[in-house]
Amino acid sequence: MCGIFAAFKHEDIHNFKPKALQLSKKIRHRGPDWSGNAVMNSTIFVHERLAIVGLDSGAQPITSADGEYMLGVNGEIYNHIQLREMCSDYKFQTFSDCEPIIPLYLEHDIDAPKYLDGMFAFCLYDSKKDRIVAARDPIGVVTLYMGRSSQSPETVYFASELKCLTDVCDSIISFPPGHVYDSETDKITRYFTPDWLDEKRIPSTPVDYHAIRHSLEKAVRKRLMAEVPYGVLLSGGLDSSLIAAIAARETEKANADANEDNNVDEKQLAGIDDQGHLHTSGWSRLHSFAIGLPNAPDLQAARKVAKFIGSIHHEHTFTLQEGLDALDDVIYHLETYDVTTIRASTPMFLLSRKIKAQGVKMVLSGEGSDEIFGGYLYFAQAPSAAEFHTESVQRVKNLHLADCLRANKSTMAWGLEARVPFLDKDFLQLCMNIDPNEKMIKPKEGRIEKYILRKAFDTTDEPDVKPYLPEEILWRQKEQFSDGVGYSWIDGLRDTAERAISDAMFANPKADWGDDIPTTKEAYWYRLKFDAWFPQKTAADTVMRWIPKADWGCAEDPSGRYAKIHEKHVSA
């Protein structure tokens, strides 16, 4: 993954170039390995590179052999080997997994993103037509913003982070996932159109446990495509533990296959070949990483998992004060004032710095499972299967403003890439079409949250299959990440906010906040910090607040401890 900045149809592009380089420098943390830029006509692309695939020849922006097309990409394309074979008539200039986007555009025009399997945000410039095409991956795992300026209405700007655009744009949006922009029509249209996106359509497909297992294993395998050392974020919760368990098996298998093959081609592209075999580089054993306050529930669980799956485990702790000291930087990098995002991002931000210092550039993470399977404890209060499903679809649709934003920005703040197997297109297609009655939380029937995901990896009735996880982990109750790192983390944030925000301040919110009024002192405190970095109203308009369903009788605080079924429930 990397950082991109683009300005299309700038009236004075050559004099603007120094400013473009300055703006792109604001996201150099995303791509510390190399900086590149290219100008065609009145358009400039700037790219900050984090090299993971195509190390020697994958620098960007990529220009086609005829010099007519320019491409800047932030992301990873997992099916690039197959796409290269599809586009065999095209003269490839690099071994980058992203370059197939150019021949796909030549053949399929703005439908090109439909053929990509990966996480991405890209801008492609067609100099013959003086046209820019921009697109974002189906769920929004990778961040992308689009902006305009009333001072130069014809110019369109794109960037990986908000901070690149606030100096030059007075109108900024978070580019919608699964959409493509075409300057010829000046419209953003949806290219990702699975049937499950219609939240009014309630699926009725019975659960297939083996299909869930097989699909998630394949999703993890794809995401181990790398030419650098990689690891896995391991909280000790169900989601990260399953990803770690599968990744450990796939890493072991890939190494065994490589050792058996005496004719390994050193030029073999990293990725999945036509036979489904993984070609990757890295350590011979999976490395796992965990963080928490001393004696946190997550740390204890993560140790058990690491020992069980045989990973080389790295445990890091932080103090409450270290977390508080990092808040301003976290909000600057996250570009949000949402309470639950900031609570969960701070430990992830601190851990990412530690991981990068150990020479790792890529990690797998467990985001997306709670949205797909209704794993948040407040889902237990869903009045019906239909409402359960509708809420699940809404949560998946909004992931780009919540957990995906957190996973992307808190890691990329240190040049560390996070990949999320649960948000694989095929896995989503399978699991979002399961009858929601199968997903509902029914404690009286012994069906806890994410029951069908747990059951899919329960090998109790399969004596010939090695267990994936210890039983107490496979069936461990859901903890919000911000809870699992230590309950005193959230308590400490609240107490500090209570001291920082007086009753008088809280009773008199800023007039320019409009209807978006903080309902707690903690939220007020974060909003003030956000405004210090991003005072523009258009910046605040890109933020979404993550709040449980009030009309289900849920507490407003997003902490899982406020859910009635939590083992350590507290009252609001």
Curated annotation (Swiss-Prot):
Catalytic activity reads: L-aspartate + L-glutamine + ATP + H2O = L-asparagine + L-glutamate + AMP + diphosphate + H(+)
Q: Where does L-glutamine bind?
A: 49-53, 74-76, 97
A cellular component term from Gene Ontology for this protein is: cytoplasm
Bilayer-spanning residue ranges: none
- InterPro entries per the UniProt record, alphabetical: Asn_synth_AEB, Asn_synthase, Asn_Synthetase, AsnB_N, GATase_2_dom, Ntn_hydrolases_N, Rossmann-like_a/b/a_fold
One Pfam short name: GATase_7
> Which PROSITE patterns does the protein's record reference?
GATASE_TYPE_2
User: Glutamine amidotransferase type-2 domain: from which residue to which, for each copy?
Assistant: 2-186
**Protein EC:** 6.3.5.4
Binding annotation for ATP:
233, 291, 365-366
Any GO BP annotation? asparagine biosynthetic process
* Pathway annotation from the record: Amino-acid biosynthesis; L-asparagine biosynthesis; L-asparagine from L-aspartate (L-Gln route): step 1/1
Indicate what this protein is called per its UniProt record: Asparagine synthetase [glutamine-hydrolyzing] 2
- Lineage, broadest ranks: Eukaryota, Fungi, Dikarya, Ascomycota, Saccharomycotina
